[in-house]
């Protein structure tokens, strides 16, 4: 059975469906750019310019006199004044720190100086003048005086950095010292509080030994009799309280303090018969003289004083 040929409308719809599917696939892969355009990647071409490479090689191989080139190659140059190796010199041999301005500038200076010293004999052999004529007044980019100023400035900067580092270390040490001192003081306070609590317990009879004693001394143990006395004393007031009661009087509970007891009832040592029956040496009918003046006398004295 032969299939009927597709019409133009059917072919256009199939093309649209295919293009829509391609756009969806490109969008899912992230290849769509603004404007719904798909950027097609072009294949990279390997450039092999043989003639250009040969021309560069010919320029490298050009044999010129050294006077025309005046090139010299030197490695890292150590300081001349260094006789013994130091950790700083060993670090310089390993490599110059690009962040250190002083070290970097000094390496440039030493390398340039060594290159000049290596080239001068060869220039003298070739009879090339190396000194500036007297009528040549053009100065170089940086004179020796300017270089000396730069050197002094770099030295000052390095000294300031070292001073700042030392100050930081001192501050850190002081902070650590204060922290240690605070810990020591807190430890002493805790030990003192523990010792005072142990002494109070020992005095009140709650403990029979003192654990804070150190050294060769054995811990003091309370005997049975001492412990018994301590327990008995703990029931009543201590010596300080008894002394204050004796001096200022008992300031505690007053209710029932004047009640009679069996011991006070049987105690007749303070009984005086003459005083009880009024047979003392006092004269009857005479009372002690009243030293305070009367009301009228006080008013008269007050008016006279005005």
Swiss-Prot record:
Residues 91-103, 213-224 have a biased composition (Basic and acidic residues). The modification N-acetylmethionine is found at residue 1. Interacts with WDR46. One of its GO terms (biological process) is ribosome biogenesis. Its main location: nucleus. The modification Phosphothreonine is found at residue 3. Belongs to the EBP2 family. There is a cross-link at residues 93, 179, 218 (Glycyl lysine isopeptide (Lys-Gly) (interchain with G-Cter in SUMO2)). The modification Phosphoserine is found at residues 7, 9, 11, 13, 264, 270. It comes from Mus musculus. GO terms for cellular component: chromosome; nucleolus. Keywords: Acetylation, Coiled coil, Isopeptide bond, Nucleus, Phosphoprotein, Ribosome biogenesis, Ubl conjugation. It is found in: Nucleus, Nucleolus. Residues 135-171 form a coiled coil. The keyword Calcium does not apply. This is Probable rRNA-processing protein EBP2. Residues 1-20, 75-103, 150-169, 213-306 are annotated as: Disordered. It comes from the Eukaryota. Required for the processing of the 27S pre-rRNA. InterPro entries: Ebp2. Residues 274-306 have a biased composition (Basic residues).
């Amino acid at each position: 059975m032969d299939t009927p040929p597709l019409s133009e409308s059917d072919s256009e719809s199939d093309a649209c469906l295919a293009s829509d599917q391609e756009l969806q696939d490109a969008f899912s892969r992230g290849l769509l750019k603004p404007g719904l355009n798909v950027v097609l990647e072009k294949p990279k071409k390997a450039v092999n310019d043989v003639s250009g490479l040969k021309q560069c090689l010919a320029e490298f191989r050009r044999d010129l006199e050294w006077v025309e080139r005046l090139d010299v190659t030197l490695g890292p140059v150590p300081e001349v004044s260094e006789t013994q190796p130091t950790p700083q010199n060993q670090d310089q041999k390993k490599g110059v720190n690009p962040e250190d301005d002083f070290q970097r500038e000094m390496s440039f200076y030493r390398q340039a100086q060594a290159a000049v010293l290596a080239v001068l004999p060869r220039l003298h052999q070739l009879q090339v003048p190396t000194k500036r004529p007297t009528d040549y007044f053009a100065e170089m980019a940086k004179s020796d005086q300017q270089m000396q100023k730069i050197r002094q400035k770099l030295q000052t900067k390095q000294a300031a950095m070292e001073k700042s580092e030392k100050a930081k270390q001192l501050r850190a040490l002081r902070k650590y010292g204060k922290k240690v001192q605070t810990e020591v003081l807190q430890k002493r306070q805790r030990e003192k509080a523990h010792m005072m609590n142990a002494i109070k317990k020992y005095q009140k009879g709650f403990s029979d030994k003192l654990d804070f004693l150190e050294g060769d001394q054995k811990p003091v143990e309370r005997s049975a009799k001492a412990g018994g006395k301590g327990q008995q004393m703990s029931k009543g007031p201590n010596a300080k309280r008894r002394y204050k009661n004796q001096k200022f009087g008992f300031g505690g509970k007053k209710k029932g303090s004047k009640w009679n007891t069996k011991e006070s009832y049987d105690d007749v040592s303070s009984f005086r018969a003459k005083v009880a029956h009024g047979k003392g040496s006092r004269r009857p009918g005479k009372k002690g003289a009243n030293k305070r003046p009367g009301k009228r006398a006080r008013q008269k004295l007050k008016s006279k004083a005005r």
